From Swiss-Prot:
Database matches in InterPro entries: Kinase-like_dom_sf, Prot_kinase_dom, Protein_kinase_ATP_BS, Ser/Thr_kinase_AS, Ser/Thr_Kinases-Pseudokinases
Miscellaneous notes: This protein is synthesized as a Gag-Mht or Gag-Mil polyprotein.
Functional description taken from the UniProt entry: By itself the v-Mil oncogene has only weak transforming capacity but it abolishes the growth factor requirements of avian macrophages transformed by other oncogenes.
Region (Disordered): 1-67
Protein encoded by which gene: V-MIL
Protein name: Serine/threonine-protein kinase-transforming protein mil
Domain of life: Viruses
Length: 380
């Protein structure tokens, strides 16, 4: 796990910078200056903190020393600065509002009442990881709030969720577009897993389509919130919507059933939605029966419903992601390779048609306005 940066390092850097700042400093390049123009701290820095001076000068100028505080404090947003407007919807772990904070934002107020000190610290530790996520296919994390309720602030999206496109508006995508949505989603998930973040609630409601079909994944991480607490003891419980939950997560036999492979299973259900236009188990209208059947391995999504023009390699990928034994599922690097091969084998006219959405938003800081759930949540 990534260690939070100690704010003392930043304060030393600011202090040293102000001491050494002079008119000649801009023209010269003294030995103690870093390439960005920041003085290096004179005190030795522990190994895990060596990367602290690596952020750009502009960002550092925004940081004001506030005593001996953990650096995650600099990402805390005062509740009084945020203006909440429309209530967008409720999910498994909280309620989402559209808000204003230096522009449009989405504010997710979490369903954690009176957090214990352990819970609060765990939340802060996770925020330290979430704030380091920057990827074109990931919804941008902007900060957190702790007054009254724990809350997460992210970029706002104007479009619709994949769930809404597929199951409410019934948008007619072409096969190459469906495959590209699958690729971008896998790309975002691969990035999260490389950061050691397990999503735990991957589903079409948490995938947002922005502009030229650019995928944004939201509501990731936050294991603290997506678990039940009993005193100081953390007890995992099934989270998210059951249609997307892996059999081992439904069974809850392990103390922590969440893994990269449980995310892959959920992604497999998203692939199923993309390649059928339907939700799985539509013939079973009893939630408890789905939990029982899937958990025991008696039911699995009906792959005969996949579109007739769904490429064979995609059919294989859907089946592999939905394997009942989690160790048999591929991980995202392998999934991405499969999709890349698949896209390469598509007719060239289709491949070129999808290129604008592949390359338009190549900057990792892509913070264009983007969708949060303006969608009805599924029944299950």
């Amino acid at each position: 796990p990534t260690m939070p940066v100690d704010s003392r390092i930043i304060e030393d850097a600011i202090r040293n910078h102000s001491e050494s700042a002079s008119p000649s400093a801009s023209s010269g390049s003294p030995n103690n200056m870093s390439p960005t123009g920041w003085s290096q701290p004179k005190t030795p820095v522990p190994a895990q903190r060596e990367r602290a001076p690596g952020t750009n000068t502009q960002e550092k100028n925004k940081i004001r020393p506030r005593g001996q505080r953990d650096s995650s404090y600099y990402w805390e947003i005062e509740a009084s600065e945020v203006l909440l407007s429309t209530r967008i919807g409720s999910g498994s772990f909280g309620t989402v509002y559209k808000g204003k904070w230096h522009g449009d934002v989405a504010v997710k107020i979490l369903k954690v009442v009176d957090p214990t000190p352990e819970q609060f610290q765990a939340f802060r530790n996770e925020v330290a990881v979430l704030r380091k996520t920057r990827h074109v296919n990931i919804l941008l994390f902007m900060g957190y709030m702790t007054k009254d309720n724990l809350a997460i602030v992210t970029q706002w999206c104007e479009g619709s969720s994949l769930y809404k496109h597929l199951h409410v508006q019934e948008t007619k995508f072409q096969m190459f577009q469906l495959i590209d949505i699958a690729r971008q989603t896998a790309q975002g998930m691969d990035y999260l897993h490389a950061k050691n973040i397990i999503h735990r609630d991957m589903k079409s409601n948490n995938i947002f389509l922005h502009g030229g079909l650019t995928v944004k994944i939201g509501d990731f991480g936050l294991a603290t919130v997506k678990s039940r607490w009993s005193g100081s003891q953390q007890v995992e419980q099934p989270t998210g919507s059951i249609l997307w939950m892996a059999p081992e997560v439904i069974r809850m036999q392990d103390s922590n059933p969440f893994s990269f492979q449980s995310d892959v299973y959920s992604y497999g259900i998203v692939l199923y939605e993309l390649m059928t236009g339907e939700l799985p188990y539509s013939h079973i209208n009893n939630r408890d029966q789905i939990i029982f059947m899937v958990g025991r391995g008696y039911a699995s999504p009906d792959l005969s419903k996949l579109y007739k023009n769904c490429p064979k390699a995609m059919k294989r990928l859907v089946a592999d992601c939905l394997k009942k034994v989690r160790e048999e599922r591929p991980l995202f690097p392998q999934i991405l390779s499969s999709i890349a091969l698949l896209q390469h084998s598509l007719p060239k006219i289709n491949r070129s048609a999808s290129e604008p959405s592949l390359h338009r938003a190549s900057h990792t800081e892509d913070i264009n306005s983007c969708t949060l759930t303006s969608t009805r949540l599924p029944v299950f």
